[in-house]
């Protein structure tokens, strides 16, 4: 189900601003056939010297006395033949001075999809979201036994389930961490528009408007649940945390965008994370071949467009917030009671 993601896309997603100098370091970590890794980097302006690479199964703990590999910075990449059977994190130290932590953003699962780590995003001050702290996913009701093992290995302590009460009852989570919090965000799911699509009253061109309205509705009508979410995020004992909904494309997407915005991640990177879902999900897999949605090309196009995420949905919704509140800072402080002091605490937990 997972589509191959190009280096250029991940370069955007893993853009790293080095706070110590006026250079930028861009790093990407990918798996290659055989389960090994290739780590690629670029430095701006070009940097000479040596990069040392360290490995750990823990995102915040590296043995810097024993490098896994080293390479000339000018080479730009290093193949890593290394397998532990667990998730691996890598710390790159450039010229014994500048360091960047990286890992694979997307974690392949058997039943779950759209599962990814929200680490590795940089804000304007050069602070990086911590790897291994916060994940977003499709519904945990899709978890298989191998998925459950993977989630255990990730050390997941808390799940925040944004699905409706009806969805949770009809499809209970198959992975239950130490604590689960049901926060059923208000708002329509795409599937409620099935009849309008089948009758061709909703066309593909209408979907972007629907997506804008849905995203805005979620933001405007769930402040109580978002406040509860941030309260959980402000307690370091709750981590690692996974947030999930049905497909991980709407409710979880809104929540992830808010969290990244609260950490001062710029809108470009927030949009890139949001749009990544389109590369991780085979939307046609959700439409049975004998489904009425497959009997007509126009209907199929509209329904597929409805399932996809659209850039304008998130930019429109955040622009609307800024227009109403004057700034995202005012929105967090007024609508979500997330004061500057609380945001600083959140940054202490979520950034390094």
Where does each model-flagged region fall?
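Sec-dependent N-terminal signal peptides
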Residues: 5-14
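Cys-dependent protein tyrosine phosphatase-like superfamily
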Residues: 19-241, 255-352
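Short cysteine clusters
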Residues: 245
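Substrate/cofactor-recognition hotspot
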Residues: 248
């Amino acid at each position: 189900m997972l589509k191959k993601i190009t280096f250029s896309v991940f370069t955007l997603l893993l853009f790293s601003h080095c706070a110590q100098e006026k250079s930028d370091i861009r790093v990407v970590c990918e798996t290659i056939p055989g389960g090994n890794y290739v780590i690629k980097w670029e430095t701006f302006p070009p940097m000479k010297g040596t990069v040392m690479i360290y490995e750990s199964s823990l995102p915040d703990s590296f043995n810097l006395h024993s490098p896994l590999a080293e390479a000339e910075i000018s080479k730009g990449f290093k193949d890593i033949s290394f397998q532990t059977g667990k998730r691996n994190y890598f710390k790159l130290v450039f010229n014994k001075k500048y360091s960047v932590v990286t890992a694979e953003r997307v974690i392949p699962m058997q039943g779950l999809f759209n599962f990814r780590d929200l680490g590795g995003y940089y804000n304007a001050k050069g602070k990086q979201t911590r790897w291994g702290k916060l994940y977003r996913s499709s519904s945990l009701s899709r978890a298989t036994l191998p998925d459950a093992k993977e989630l255990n290995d990730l050390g997941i302590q808390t799940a925040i389930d944004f699905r409706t009460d009806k969805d949770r009852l009809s499809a209970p989570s198959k992975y239950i961490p130490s604590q689960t919090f049901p926060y059923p965000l208000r708002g329509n799911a795409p599937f409620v528009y099935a009849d309008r699509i089948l009758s061709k009253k909703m066309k593909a061109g209408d979907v972007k408007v629907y997506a804008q309205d849905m995203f805005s509705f979620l933001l405007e009508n769930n402040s109580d649940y978002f406040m509860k979410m941030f309260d959980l995020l402000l307690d370091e004992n709750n981590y690692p945390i996974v947030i999930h909904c049905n497909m991980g494309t709407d409710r979880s997407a809104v929540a992830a965008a808010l969290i990244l915005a609260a950490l001062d991640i710029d809108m470009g990177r927030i949009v890139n994370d949001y749009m990544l879902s389109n590369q991780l999900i085979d939307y046609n897999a959700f439409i049975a071949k004998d489904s009425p949605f497959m009997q007509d090309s126009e209907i199929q196009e509209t329904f597929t467009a409805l399932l996809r995420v659209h850039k304008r949905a998130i930019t429109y919704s955040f622009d609307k917030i800024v227009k109403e509140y004057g700034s995202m800072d005012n929105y967090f402080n007024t609508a979500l009671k997330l004061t500057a002091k609380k945001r600083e605490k959140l940054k202490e937990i979520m950034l390094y």
